[in-house]
């Protein structure tokens, strides 16, 4: 919610409202963000080449193992993404209340929808003055849940289902994700949806990076530096 609705009420409310810096993101959350960002880049690049392999190279296989290294990097980054996501879910329970914003979208609150519409208008250059937010703004929160949370879960489930084919029947991946391929119909269908999911996340990353840079420049609070140092820096002391 907007800054004035995010702060506690009381005698010291006005003083708190005028703070120009608030500690928002704890170290584990920031570490997760950048590790996840790196893993998504690795997954995107290696996944593209897995979907469109390089031309066959003549000679001994041991001397031409590039695709093998690419697949290994893809699998390793997939583990990092999945394990990191589980750690992020854990931190939502033990971290501060900002750590829960990624998973708990307050769609039941009328004020949230009002501010969501304000953010849509702001991003479309129809609002002259943006609001101040300590955590995610409503549009950012909704986008993170719809694109990242749902996208990461989908890619992890379909990815490990395909990984299970290589590990074989009876493997841990087959026992946990063997139901996915029959659900989609066949292995190729899962490959196709997994490939489309990659582009889904690529589009999200492009929009996310653009809007983060845009907000850092034209909004009333820091964004990129907040995910580095944890502190949200405000450019003015007005509460709204």
From Swiss-Prot:
Keywords: Cell membrane, Electron transport, Heme, Iron, Membrane, Metal-binding, Transmembrane, Transmembrane helix, Transport. GO terms for cellular component: plasma membrane. One of its GO terms (molecular function) is heme binding. It is a multi-pass membrane protein. The keyword Cell division does not apply. One of its GO terms (biological process) is respiratory electron transport chain. The chain crosses the membrane at residues 31-51, 75-95, 142-163, 196-213. It is found in: Cell membrane. Belongs to the HupC/HyaC/HydC family. Probable b-type cytochrome. This is Probable Ni/Fe-hydrogenase B-type cytochrome subunit. It comes from Azotobacter chroococcum mcd 1.
